[in-house]
């Protein structure tokens, strides 16, 4: 019985006076939370940079595809043109040369 009392007293003293790691573990948990928040922000910034680079690359590829595609909505040779109806690439929108009574400009071949 004396042995049990001695162990109980020893257990009581060790739990009340003993140094617990609760404060240390709470501080470590807080530090880990702060570090994980910082690392998450850094990771997010890196992902945004990668995404921006990919979007730029995709945009450039789309522009190249558009450059190779057929030209749309352009006016042909000797057809009236204005700000709404543009001439095709190899044509230019000019006033008719010998006729002053035409009211609009026409698409002509570019002079070399």
UniProtKB/Swiss-Prot annotation:
UniProt-recorded Gene Ontology molecular function terms: sodium channel inhibitor activity; toxin activity
Domain of life: Eukaryota
Family annotation (Pfam families): Toxin_22
Keywords: Cleavage on pair of basic residues, Disulfide bond, Ion channel impairing toxin, Secreted, Signal, Toxin
Cysteine-cysteine disulfides: 74-88, 81-93, 87-107
Transmembrane spans: none
Propeptide residues, chain positions: 19-73
GO cellular component terms, A-Z: extracellular region
Tissue and organ expression note: Expressed by the venom gland.
Principal cellular location given in the protein's record: secreted
Family, as annotated: Belongs to the neurotoxin 14 (magi-1) family. 08 (Ltx-4) subfamily.
The protein's role, per its UniProt record: Probable ion channel inhibitor.
Record's protein name: U15-hexatoxin-Hi1a
Annotated source species: Hadronyche infensa (Fraser island funnel-web spider)
């Amino acid at each position: 019985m004396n042995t049990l009392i001695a162990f109980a007293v020893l257990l009581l003293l060790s739990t009340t006076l003993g140094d617990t790691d609760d404060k240390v573990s709470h501080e470590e948990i807080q530090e880990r939370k702060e570090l994980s928040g910082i690392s998450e922000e850094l990771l997010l910034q890196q992902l945004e940079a990668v995404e921006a680079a990919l979007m730029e690359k995709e945009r450039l590829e789309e522009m190249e595809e558009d450059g190779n595609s057929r030209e749309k909505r352009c006016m042909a040779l000797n057809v009236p043109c204005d700000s709404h109806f543009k001439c095709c690439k190899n044509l230019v929108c000019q006033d008719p040369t010998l006729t002053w009574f035409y009211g609009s400009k026409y698409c002509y071949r570019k002079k070399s």
